[in-house]
């Protein structure tokens, strides 16, 4: 299997790593160096990512979606692509759907590759996807949360209500902040639970089940 994938490996490609967690930034950067990539910069903020692009002219950027307070990885990727229309873009995150960061996220740059950290059990798989992003930076690619997953059929408003529930807001508080009735929020919660595959028998602890599903889809199971 390794031999069939070797063709897709790009050696010595200039790469910048944008990841706000210092440990992940260090270990992943070291691992990708062993795979032959030229890691020009390892940064944790949007500002440093743009500065690294200006200094190093990378062929590809590997980005976490959630960079903490401020710009997201998607915002950074859009800025990088504006400066270089053919830079390869790869997102590596625990989130199964980026709308859990921001329900009104901008469109991902054309050709962006989205990888889930929990499904990438080896850096070899990540290295192959990075190479594909370099070879075909603008190729049409299907995004995993669009075609499948419990959140794929949920609207932006439902995602926001899901986040409100996870934050501990009551039905009355959610209704008040959204300017709608509590009955409307109750209906939305029932639709959300259906989308998440929560059985009707779970009514007594429905909120607990919804919160658990929220964190599972963030890659932070409880």
Regions found by a protein language model. Name each.
Residues 2, 193-222:
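Basic, Lys/Arg-enriched C-terminal extension of HTH/homeodomain DNA-binding domains
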Residues 30, 51, 128, 163, ...:
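DNA-binding alpha-helical recognition surfaces that contact promoter or target DNA
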Residues 56, 156, 160, 187, ...:
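Intrinsically disordered, low-complexity protein-interaction/activation regions
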Residues 162-169, 214:
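Short helix-to-turn junction characteristic of helix-turn-helix DNA-binding domains
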Residues 7, 69, 153-154, 203:
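Residue-level marker of regulatory loop/turn positions in helix-turn-helix DNA-binding domains and
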Residues 139-164:
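Regulatory hinge/linker segments at domain boundaries
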Residues 170-206:
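Recognition helix of helix-turn-helix DNA-binding domains
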Residues 1-141:
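N-terminal regulatory/sensing modules of transcriptional regulators
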């Amino acid at each position: 299997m390794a031999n069939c994938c070797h063709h897709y490996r790009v050696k010595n490609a200039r790469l910048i790593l944008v990841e706000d967690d210092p440990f992940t930034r260090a270990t992943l950067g070291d691992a990708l160096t062993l795979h032959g990539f030229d890691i020009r910069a390892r940064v944790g903020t949007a500002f440093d990512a743009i500065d690294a692009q200006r200094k190093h002219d990378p062929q590809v950027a590997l980005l976490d979606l959630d960079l903490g307070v401020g710009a997201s990885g998607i915002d950074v990727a859009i800025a990088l692509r504006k400066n270089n229309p053919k830079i390869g873009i790869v997102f590596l995150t625990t989130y199964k759907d980026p709308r859990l960061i921001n329900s009104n996220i901008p469109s991902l740059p054309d050709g962006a590759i989205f990888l889930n950290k929990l499904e990438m059990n080896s850096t070899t798989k990540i290295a192959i996807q990075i190479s594909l992003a370099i070879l075909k930076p603008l190729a049409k690619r299907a995004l995993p949360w669009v075609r499948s997953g419990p959140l794929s059929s949920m609207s932006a408003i439902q995602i926001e209500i899901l986040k409100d529930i996870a934050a501990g807001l009551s039905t009355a508080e959610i209704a008040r902040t959204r300017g709608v009735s509590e009955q409307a929020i109750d209906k939305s919660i029932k639709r959300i639970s259906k989308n998440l595959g929560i059985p009707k028998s779970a009514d007594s602890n429905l909120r607990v089940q919804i919160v658990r599903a929220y964190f599972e889809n963030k890659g932070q199971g409880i």
